[in-house]
Amino acid sequence: MAPKINKIVNGPIPDSFLADETKRLDSLKFDGQRLEVLDQLLLPHEFKYIPVNDVSDAFNVIKSMQVRGAPLIAVVGSLGLLLEFNKNSELNIETIREKIEYLITSRPTAVDLRNSVTGLIPILETEGITDDEKLAKCQEYLLNVYTAEKLQNRILLWNAYQELLTAFPGKEKFTVMTICNTGSLATVSWGTALGVIRALHSENRLNLAYVLETRPYNQGIRLTATELLHGQVPFKLITDSMAAWAMKNHQLDCVLVGADNVARNGDTANKIGTYMLAVLCKHHNINFYPVVPFTTINKNISSGEEIKIEERAASELLRVNGVLVGNSECPVWNPAFDVTPAHLITKILTDFGNWSPAALEEQIPR
């Protein structure tokens, strides 16, 4: 799905922008034939890449959260399908449909995965071409999911960076806050919200980033802190419950978050705790920005009421690194995501331009 306007804000993008690739971690390794993904459950203590050979492997690493982040799981799901096609050249449309639906169930809230793999269906339904031609087109499409994510991510980060410069004219350095992990470990490039923080740092415009630990899966302390330490980016780690006090006492300029699903009206589903930050931003008069690829915007739903929220196992809340930290009989509610209403959002920053939620829907093709 492409918007009506393809806009690079204040372009062209200089070659120097985020040019130093050694400053970021690699979430996967892919040479066209073999795929290995970084097992993020082992971070920060061990860096281990594990093979993904087919759809079943892709499902397992996504479901278990060995890989996570909306853009990354879309790529891993797509490459899993590609490797499946490479192993088995027999094109059975019903079997492929089943594999697509199977992949989607691995993380049902994440619309990027759904959008990416269901993009095969129009190809499969094309009339007047042979099965071999359909297979070739499917393989080309799935590979493009991977290559396009890299290209569009750079545009996304440039657009978001330019929005901050425009929203805060004359400001030399920014103090920001983020939740979860939205960096290179959530994408195949620099990231979304955390990528903007990396861009600010690379341009010498970052004062400090406050990073929420992000319970119960601890993506902030395990993943985001690991990325920022690797890139020598100034940050402070805080617990989720410290966010309000940090906003009151440390003159934040904005909160930058990612998203797994954005409705047509701008309602935004993201990691649990994001809604809390948006409410706090409203109270403290702080700008609140989801930073998302346009593929995360779901043209099929009108509001956040239609977003399915994944609920995960009680053990994820009761255990840390496998160690039981509470009574195993505790009743638990563990939603993985929440939905931030559009009226709490300053702008949604995308690779096709930056819009207020009210203006966003006008850009979405029907």
Swiss-Prot record:
Gene3D superfamilies per the record? translation initiation factor eif-2b, domain 1, Translation initiation factor eif-2b, domain 2
The UniProt record lists the keyword Amino-acid biosynthesis: yes
Query: What reaction gets catalysed by this protein?
Result: 5-(methylsulfanyl)-alpha-D-ribose 1-phosphate = 5-(methylsulfanyl)-D-ribulose 1-phosphate
Marked site positions, Transition state stabilizer: C180
According to its UniProt record, the EC number is 5.3.1.23
The SS bond pairs are none
A GO MF term:
S-methyl-5-thioribose-1-phosphate isomerase activity
Which Pfam families does the UniProt record give? IF-2B
**Where are the active-site residues found?**
D260
A single GO cellular-component term on record: nucleus
Listed A to Z, the keywords are: Amino-acid biosynthesis, Cytoplasm, Isomerase, Methionine biosynthesis, Nucleus
Pathway as given in its UniProt record: Amino-acid biosynthesis; L-methionine biosynthesis via salvage pathway; L-methionine from S-methyl-5-thio-alpha-D-ribose 1-phosphate: step 1/6
State the top-level EC class.
isomerase
Domain of life of the source: Eukaryota
The question of whether Nucleus is a record keyword is answered with yes
Q: Where does it localize?
A: Cytoplasm; Nucleus
Q: Which BP terms from GO are recorded? A: L-methionine salvage from methylthioadenosine
Q: What family, per the record?
A: Belongs to the eIF-2B alpha/beta/delta subunits family. MtnA subfamily.
Briefly state the protein's biological role.
Answer: Catalyzes the interconversion of methylthioribose-1-phosphate (MTR-1-P) into methylthioribulose-1-phosphate (MTRu-1-P).
Indicate what this protein is called per its UniProt record. Answer: Methylthioribose-1-phosphate isomerase
What does the organism's lineage look like at the top? Eukaryota, Metazoa, Ecdysozoa, Nematoda, Chromadorea
